[in-house]
């Protein structure tokens, strides 16, 4: 079995993630990590809250609170919400942990010693009113590439391009809105030019990168990589370890991406196996997979590999960065200021976690932007989750419970139809496996659902309710194979809807662990079923209207409160 490090993009903690953030990184990573565990692989799945840098510091200044207090309160809330979403992190940490701070400082000192860091004096924006330098999100303006009006000093969130504050058109202070002045300051730079050829080779020869990640990265490389400042003048962050860099901090993106390593270090430290992190990150056979939205591609496909190469510590290069396109909400971008979208705390007040997980994976934006709409969600829940999956499971188990003594019937002598059905189920299961392996999670789930659809057609064609009256052996064979197909269905859907899959497993009376191989094992004849009940229920249009009214009421309560940690519903 293989070793995997799975990482999902580290969310900023100035607010909780929305549905688009979830499917773009955390939920997708969880589905893949769960699949790998079902296959028996050794998996360490990590992430954490990105608590440093300008996003938190700007918000804290505006609210008049300490950035550390702000970020730790929000981190605890986000961590709890991920648990409620059944995200199976081995460790969810934060970038202010002692382990991360020490790791980052030691890592950058090594890069400095290797000669990849140089100093340069540069003009940087400064707000004379607030008497602060304006790195990254402290300064906003118009993007020179796409014209987006609120591009940040380090990156445009609209087009994803990395920026320098000097490139912004009509820049202003994000705190007070004043026009900045420019002052000379010294910063420490990573010399990306010296790493460019090796990064190009990594990108061009990587067969695992999705098209959007490869195309975006090659476009950046075609323009040529420029040195990037790894230090900032803001106070809230990891102190820069370089000689003479007192008062400087490490740029948040250049330290947060190292969290995928430091979190693995911290995880093994917590379980008393301190040196075992090396068995993952220092082994060239380890597969390292990141899950991010496409706006995070540059830092994962260009910057992090560059840092690993510059450090020279023998770290394994990332296998791939599974980057999604954007999820829209009712045809438009998510926007907290416009109250447009659903955030993960609100979602759980409306529907169970597995409903959300299934819908989001079912429409995952793998190759193009996709749209979440309540009408689409209603159709997926009612027709796919309830009618196809839930109804099939209930038909099979209720019939065995009520007409066959509540235990798995003998296989008997299956007909050609019975054998063809289970072979078709096995082929679908293998096809779903191939999709999971390729991180085509949407296609994987769509394929597993086909098992339920084929099962419903099989029951309708074989009509065991008639067979049982005239040929008990034939009826037994039908229901034996239908029961077996539920094993494939439960295991195939377990990465996406783990709670429901476990419920189905228990209803089937199965004691064996739910694993990929267990699905393939023929059922034990005579195995008593557990309590049989419907897995899902339909949602009416009237209920959706009531849910949206509840959502608006929740928001009126949330946004009447001052502090972000008071605006979260748990």
UniProtKB/Swiss-Prot annotation:
One of its GO terms (cellular component) is cytosol. GO terms for molecular function: ATP binding; metal ion binding; methionine-tRNA ligase activity. It catalyses: tRNA(Met) + L-methionine + ATP = L-methionyl-tRNA(Met) + AMP + diphosphate. Disulfide bonds: none annotated. Coiled coil: none annotated. Binds 1 zinc ion per subunit. Transmembrane segments: none annotated. Pfam families: Anticodon_3, tRNA-synt_1g. A motif ('HIGH' region) lies at residues 11-21. This is Methionine--tRNA ligase. The gene is metG.
């Amino acid at each position: 079995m293989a070793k995997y490090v799975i990482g999902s993009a580290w969310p900023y903690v100035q607010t909780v993630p929305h549905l688009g953030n979830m499917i773009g990184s955390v939920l997708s990573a969880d589905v893949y990590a769960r699949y790998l565990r079902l296959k028996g692989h050794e998996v360490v799945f990590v992430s954490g809250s990105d608590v440093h840098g300008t996003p938190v510091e700007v918000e804290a200044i505006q609210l008049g609170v300490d950035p550390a207090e702000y970020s730790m309160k929000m981190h605890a809330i986000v961590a709890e919400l991920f648990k409620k979403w059944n995200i199976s992190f081995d460790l969810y940490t934060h970038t202010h942990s002692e382990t991360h701070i020490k790791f980052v400082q030691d890592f950058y000192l090594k890069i400095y010693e290797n000669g990849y860091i140089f100093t340069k004096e540069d003009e940087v924006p400064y707000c004379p009113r607030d008497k602060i330098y304006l790195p990254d999100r402290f300064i906003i303006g118009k993007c020179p590439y796409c014209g987006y009006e609120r591009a940040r000093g380090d990156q445009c969130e609209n087009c994803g391009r990395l920026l320098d504050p000097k490139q912004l058109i009509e820049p202003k202070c994000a705190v007070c809105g004043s026009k900045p002045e420019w002052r000379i300051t010294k910063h420490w730079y990573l010399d990306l030019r010296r790493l460019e050829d090796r990064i190009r080779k990594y990108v061009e020869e990587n067969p695992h990168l999705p098209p959007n990640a490869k195309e975006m990265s090659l476009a950046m490389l075609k323009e040529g990589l420029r040195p990037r400042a790894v230090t900032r003048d803001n106070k809230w962050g990891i102190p820069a370890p370089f000689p003479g860099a007192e008062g400087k901090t490490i740029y948040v993106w250049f330290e947060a991406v190292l969290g995928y390593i430091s979190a693995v270090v911290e995880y093994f430290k917590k379980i008393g196996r301190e040196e075992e992190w090396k068995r993952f990150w220092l082994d060239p056979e380890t597969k390292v997979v990141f899950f991010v939205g496409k706006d995070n591609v540059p830092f994962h496909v260009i910057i992090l590999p560059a840092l690993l190469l510059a450090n020279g510590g023998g770290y394994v290069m990332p296998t791939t960065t599974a980057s999604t396109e954007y999820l829209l909400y009712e045809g438009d971008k998510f926007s907290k200021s416009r109250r447009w979208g659903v955030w993960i705390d609100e979602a759980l007040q409306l529907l169970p976690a597995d409903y959300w997980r299934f819908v989001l994976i079912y429409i995952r934006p793998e190759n193009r932007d996709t749209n979440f709409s309540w009408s689409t969600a209603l159709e997926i829940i009612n027709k796919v989750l309830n009618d196809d999956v839930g109804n099939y499971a209930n038909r099979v188990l209720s019939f065995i419970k009520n007409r066959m003594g509540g235990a798995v019937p003998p296989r008997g002598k299956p007909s050609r139809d019975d054998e063809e059905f289970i072979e078709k189920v096995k082929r679908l299961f293998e096809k779903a496996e191939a999709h999971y392996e390729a991180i085509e999670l949407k296609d994987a789930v769509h394929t597993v659902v086909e098992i339920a659809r084929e099962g419903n057609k099989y029951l309708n064609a074989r009509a065991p309710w008639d067979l049982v009256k005239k040929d008990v052996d034939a009826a037994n064979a039908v229901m034996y194979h239908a029961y077996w197909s539920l094993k494939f269905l439960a295991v195939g859907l377990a990465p996406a809807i783990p709670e429901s899959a476990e419920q189905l497993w228990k209803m089937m009376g199965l004691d064996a662990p739910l694993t990929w191989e267990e699905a393939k094992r023929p059922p034990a004849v005579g195995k008593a079923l557990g309590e049989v009940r419907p897995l899902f229920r339909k949602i009416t249009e009237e209920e959706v209207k009531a849910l949206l009214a509840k959502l608006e009421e929740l928001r009126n309560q949330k946004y009447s409160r001052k502090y972000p940690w008071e605006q979260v519903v748990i």
